[in-house]
Amino acid sequence: MENKVDIKKINEKIEKESAFIDLLRSEMNKVIVGQKNMVDKLLIGLLGKGHILLEGVPGLAKTLAINTLSKAISGSFSRIQFTPDLLPADVVGTQLYNVKQSKFSVKKGPVFANFVLADEINRAPAKVQSALLEAMQEKQVTIGEETFRLEEPFLVMATQNPIDQEGTYPLPEAQVDRFMLKTVITYPQMDDEKLIMRANLENTAVIVKPVVTLKKIMTAQKVVREVYMDEKIESYILDIIFATRYPEKYNLSDLKPLISFGASPRGSINLALAAKCYAFINRRGFVIPDDVRAVVFDVLQHRIGISYEAEAENMSSVDIITKIVNEIAVP
């Protein structure tokens, strides 16, 4: 009985604390049409203090969505266009020698912002990618002999283009694992595309106003962890994760030769957190199995290694996750 009272209290608190989500969504919907999945995943990354990798063909509003989110939240925003000639100093900053004062001064790079858009991250060499990914992990940057903390909230949203892979540097598996979510953006529906086409032909500038403060976001990042998760949901998450490592124990022996490595503990941590965030953005104080299923592909598709055999059979990590989710009993 006491547990039920607690859940009711949590639910009331979450409903109150998540009221800003509707404001944020309506502000983003002024500009972004028909990409609810992408907007939801950006909000999950923001609330979960995670970083997001967006993948999709050009022209699907990836950059626009990220830019709009930063405008709707009164925080600083910077964009880094990754190119083959980019240097780590172009991302994190460098030391400049002042001749008049005979000393070095620090010039901070674009990574010093609340929202950092890393556009076409797979176009820069590994050492540049590493500089950004280290900042993402450590939430700090070292320039010369000085270490600088990055401002909270700090969210990196990286984009990559799945086509036109010539001249690209694919992110190593260990680096990709640092992204909380990898979201694949699809084409809009025909009705949505009609609205997009009309809006662009009218050529009227839409002004996005800040509707949420940074302080409110930071409070929400703490409150989201209070969303209630039953032990049965925890077991459900762990069954999904362990099925990527030991499929034969879950009546999925046919998957064993297709998986070169399963999801790491980061997978279970991020799946649980993303499910809590999904419940939060839906104004609910407890996690249900549908929350887990709504985020499982975004959390795990970049955390499972597929074998040469899987590639030969034209199987992707998404196909493997689909089989696992269909097999694991829902609590």
Give the positions of each predicted feature.
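C-terminal engagement/docking regions of AAA+ P-loop ATPases
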Residues: 1-14, 247-331
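Conserved C-terminal "switch" segment of AAA+ ATPases
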Residues: 10-18, 31, 168, 182-254, ...
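Pre-Walker A (pre-P-loop) alpha-helix and adjacent loop at the N terminus of AAA/AAA+ ATPase modules
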Residues: 14-60, 242
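Conserved alpha-helical scaffold flanking the Walker A/P-loop in AAA+ ATPase domains
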Residues: 41-44, 97-117, 146
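Walker A/P-loop
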Residues: 46-83
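Walker B catalytic acidic pair
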Residues: 56, 119-120, 131
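P-loop (Walker A) phosphate-binding loop of NTP-binding proteins
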Residues: 57, 91, 159
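Canonical AAA+ ATPase core
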Residues: 98-103, 120, 124, 128, ...
